[in-house]
Amino acid sequence: MAAGISLTKPNIGVYTNPNHDLWVADAKPTLEEVKSGSDLKPGQVTVEIRSTGICGSDVHFWHAGCIGPMIVTGDHILGHESAGVVIAVAPDVKTLKPGDRVAIEPNIICNKCEPCLTGRYNGCEAVEFLSTPPVDGLLRRYVNHPAIWCHKIGDMSFEDGALLEPLSVALAGMDRAGVRLGDPVLVAGAGPIGLVTLLCVRAAGATPIVITDIDEGRLRFAKELVPEVRTYRVQTGLSAEENAAGILDALNDGNGSAPDAIRPRVAMECTGVESSVASAIWSVKFGGKVFVIGVGKNEMKVPFMRLSTWEIDLQYQYRYCNTWPKAIRLVKNGVINLKKLVTHRFPLEDAVKAFETAANPKTGAIKVQIMSSEEDIKAASGVNGASN
């Protein structure tokens, strides 16, 4: 550890297990290992985590114990949306130094398989993605991570640095979906990823834009975030085709059935819910695209003949690759402003309360941040105005 850096707080982490318990306890590396550097491997740096966002997948691992084949089988540390400050570097690391502020890209790849060698490392066959069982996550006070996956953020706030991860998810979708200037776009779902995607499609020049959700409060939030967006509240008692008609009405000032009505060229589906995917398919224009960012169940039914006879492309993504430098530029240069997304903040010691807040729809939480100290919370709250 570099001279001049004094650490006193023990390392703690936020755990879940197959019994769906959630608790805060001691974590590796220990404070003594951090101070001595005994646990630091070649190519790694030690980062003091200052801000971590709670992702929907974190809540899902806690409540459901799995996402598809990714199963919690023992005590497991959550979290993969983090930023902090470098406090130690391995002797062979030349790109970072103690004191550097970094955002952590939460994957460790093999650099040997075909996806890695062709630049699509999100498909690495041996990836260790932090917080995905059995690999522990970043909801800790200190963590050792490969320097190559720690991106310098300069004077960007740690909170914005943590939000680069969900922004990367949206940017990966934008790249593959091919949203263009002037495209009519549907964003399905006004959760955190849907709202970040909304910011991205607006910045890309899409117009008009309509966003959907079942929660009127989230739609109001979307309208505050992007005033020009149209909103549609999904009616759970209606069919996918009927909700699509409502989406088109919202996009066309109530005239969605008119012969010259605008249909989305691209639907960015951010929920993974079967009925929402189907509504998106019924909504887009002939030759349009439904791009699914959201994670859903293993199997689902879709209106195949609509896809076929309207030549609609149905496309998906898995995590992200090569997005972090772009995300940093977008935030640093003010093209994307993520600050309003943070609605609640908690210190690491109160992580259980933070998760309960994130998981409860009655709290109105959009993005909940877990921060290293009350001082960091006060500093961030003074800028962004969120509460705990």
UniProtKB/Swiss-Prot annotation:
pH dependence: Optimum pH is 9. Active from pH 7 to pH 11.
Annotated positions binding Zn(2+) 1: C55, H80, E81, E165
Known EC number: 1.1.1.12
Pfam families assigned to the protein according to its UniProt record, in alphabetical order: ADH_N, ADH_zinc_N
Cofactor annotation comment: Binds 2 Zn(2+) ions per subunit.
CC cofactor: Zn(2+)
TM stretches of this protein: none
Reaction(s) the record says it catalyses: L-arabinitol + NAD(+) = L-xylulose + NADH + H(+)
Disulfide-bond pairs as recorded: none
Keyword Metal-binding (UniProt): yes
Induction comment from the UniProt entry of this chain: Induced by L-arabinose, D-xylose, xylitol, L-arabinitol, and galactitol.
GO BP term (any one): L-arabinose catabolic process to xylulose 5-phosphate
Keyword Metal-binding in record: yes
Class of the enzyme per the UniProt entry, highest EC level: oxidoreductase
Family: Belongs to the zinc-containing alcohol dehydrogenase family.
Record's keyword terms, sorted: Arabinose catabolism, Carbohydrate metabolism, Metal-binding, NAD, Nucleotide-binding, Oxidoreductase, Zinc
Official protein name in the record: L-arabinitol 4-dehydrogenase
Function comment: Catalyzes the NAD-dependent oxidation of L-arabinitol to L-xylulose in the fungal L-arabinose catabolic pathway. L-arabinose catabolism is important for using plant material as a carbon source. NADP cannot act as a cosubstrate.
Residues bound to NAD(+): P192, I193, D213, R218, I293, Q317, Y318, R319
Record-linked CDD domains: sorbitol_DH (cd05285)
Known pathway: Carbohydrate degradation; L-arabinose degradation via L-arabinitol; D-xylulose 5-phosphate from L-arabinose (fungal route): step 2/5
Signal peptide from the UniProt entry: none
InterPro entries: ADH-like_C, ADH-like_N, ADH_Zn_CS, GroES-like_sf, NAD(P)-bd_dom_sf, PKS_ER, SDH-like
Binding residues for Zn(2+) 2: C110, C113, C116, C124
